[in-house]
């Protein structure tokens, strides 16, 4: 990262700040930054934002389109073309940020107006409006959950495990700041409006900074790393977490291209020989070579409907799966290597107490939880592995869901007593708490 590049970037940003069109600086930007990664440019932008250069958050956000054009051709064709589709996860993510920023602006205007208002009747109505608008801002949690539960697991698979850890921690800080701000809004008029504005600006500042990090750093990493299949998986699993303020206006159905090409004349000639061996004739600059080998046998496909010895009886894999999915509880299994290996499917994802999606399977259990809960997760796993306890139990009442949630973490051992993992089962016990009789055997 050279000083010269930073100076050029600063000049371009200031020109944008003064009203020049992005198109007028595109050529100079391309000439200076071709070959520089999106990540490096984003770091330079971040450095300028935090200096006394005069560059603002809005300036950098405007430049995002400029360097997005630069990287458009470097990212695999169809994925980049589709990111502007209304249902593509990238477009949805950015549209949510626009809607959330608009909600922040509305709250800020309401607070300013409230501060100068004297009509008590109008003030009462404005307090209701503030709570409504803050409620809209509060939908950012759905946006963050999709990022944390759908984007981060795939990033980790590609080796980008540091940004998720840092960003998730900041997300939680923003959640806490928002809760504080919301409580102050609801405390009006008992507390000064200046206290409310201070709490709101604290969360708004961090919130806008996170939008920058998401669009100028996070999305650039994703566009350079993720495949079309990754984006399809994210799109399919997004409904489970919901959306912030807006929803996709239509479903994204990508154009799928076939990667299977017809055999050409240049391909090696393959000949079958006796005893299951195969010969291939390969053309090289030195002439033709013939190689002989035995192809690997295809593994037999498991018949999910064949009966297998199963505990005290017999079941097919299909029957075992159906039974697990019909148990009145959410089950998760983490194996002895701390890998999230399985969860049952007994309820739609958007109704689950603890949401699980296929993209989480295969993650280290420590990466499946917010940083603030990491110490507790480690303590539970170690306690069960070391035999300190056979199980840990927790419970809490969820007023918003009308549920009383009971959670059990139980050690799983094989017949020889060897630790094999941890079984988590979660259930709503509120219906049992409401039983008011000692006897019932009816079938109504």
Name these PLM-found stretches:
Residues 1-141, 145-392, 396, 403-405, ...:
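Small-residue-biased structural context
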